[in-house]
Amino acid sequence: MPKMKTKKSASKRFTARPNGSFKRGQAFKRHILTKKTTKNKRHLRGTQDVHETNLKSVRAMMPYA
């Protein structure tokens, strides 16, 4: 059986954690920022956990993470 391949787009977007969860960056922070408030942009900083409903598909895309 051949080796499973990692989806490279997923490996650039998600980072695996030791407990088996994944972290991801926030969306909506690239452009059209003038209409967003400072508070809104501040809350978009940092990372979030991948939601449990999406964990199965992220694990399938990154089999060795």
From Swiss-Prot:
It comes from the Bacteria. One of its GO terms (biological process) is translation. Residues 1-27 are annotated as: Disordered. The keyword Cell division does not apply. It comes from Cupriavidus pinatubonensis (strain JMP 134 / LMG 1197). Residues 1-15 have a biased composition (Basic residues). The keyword Ribonucleoprotein applies. GO terms for molecular function: structural constituent of ribosome. This is Large ribosomal subunit protein bL35. SUPFAM superfamilies: L35p-like. Keywords: Ribonucleoprotein, Ribosomal protein. Belongs to the bacterial ribosomal protein bL35 family. The gene is rpmI. It holds the Pfam family Ribosomal_L35p. GO terms for cellular component: cytosolic large ribosomal subunit.
